[in-house]
Amino acid sequence: MQRIDHFNDPNAPRANTLIPAASAIIANEHGEILLHQRSDNNFWALPGGTMEIGENIRQTVIREAREETGLEVQPQRIVGIYSDPKHVIEYPDGEVRQEFSICFACRIVGGKLRTSDESFAIRFFSPHDLERLNMHESTHIRIQHFLEHSQNPFIG
């Protein structure tokens, strides 16, 4: 079994963990958004992952972006704080995690783009190309909030 994201699914298993996480929306100078195709569920996704003991959430998003993309980034603003109890992630080991993620808009400051052991592919997409991609609804929501350029982060 692979990782399964449940979103507004009445048949989803009940969450048994809650772990802070961060994701990065990395846009290039053309306004294209960086996504990687995950090896655990084949979805296109934003770079990101869980917080480790001893780091703050800013360090989490920088580390995860580096690990998953090869790029060095600088967080610029918070796009949103996502904690919907109707979004749970089911893992093969029996863990069912309630989402709790802070999404950051990030600027590239260095590094070289590459895939990681967590992805099949990585590339920039123009916003109008995103609808055709195999992507979880929660990723679409984060990108939509980013493209709205709101002064206030989404909280929900």
Q: What are these language model-derived features?
A:
Residues 1-23:
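Acidic, metal-coordinating catalytic segment for phosphate/diphosphate chemistry
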Residues 72-81:
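A short coil-to-beta-strand element that immediately follows conserved catalytic motifs
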Residues 19, 39-41, 46, 73, ...:
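Short connector loops at helix/strand junctions that flank enzyme active sites
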Residues 42-43, 112-156:
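Nudix hydrolase/Nudix homology domain
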Residues 26, 103-107, 124:
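Short, well-ordered beta-strand micro-motif
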Residues 83-112:
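Active-site-adjacent beta-strand/loop module that shapes the phosphate/pyrophosphate-binding cleft
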